């Protein structure tokens, strides 16, 4: 099940590692930090912003 992330919430959140902006990947239900090359999961509509919960990405 995919849920939409409120754009207002996305505008408030930053990467906990770089403090940079995040993008929302609807398909994978993750918040992407291009600078840190991390993908933070969204579980039950709640972004999990812990670096140890993120996965490395190649982007």
UniProtKB/Swiss-Prot annotation:
InterPro entries: Trm112-like. Gene3D superfamilies: 2.20.25.10. One of its GO terms (cellular component) is cytosol. PANTHER family: PROTEIN PREY, MITOCHONDRIAL (PTHR33505:SF4), ZGC:162634 (PTHR33505). Belongs to the UPF0434 family. This is UPF0434 protein GOX0764.
């Amino acid at each position: 099940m995919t849920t939409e992330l409120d754009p207002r919430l996305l505008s408030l959140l930053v990467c906990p590692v770089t403090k940079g902006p995040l993008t929302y990947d609807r398909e994978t239900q993750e918040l992407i930090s291009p600078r840190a090359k991390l993908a933070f999961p969204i579980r039950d509509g709640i972004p999990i912003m812990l670096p140890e919960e993120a996965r490395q990405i190649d982007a």
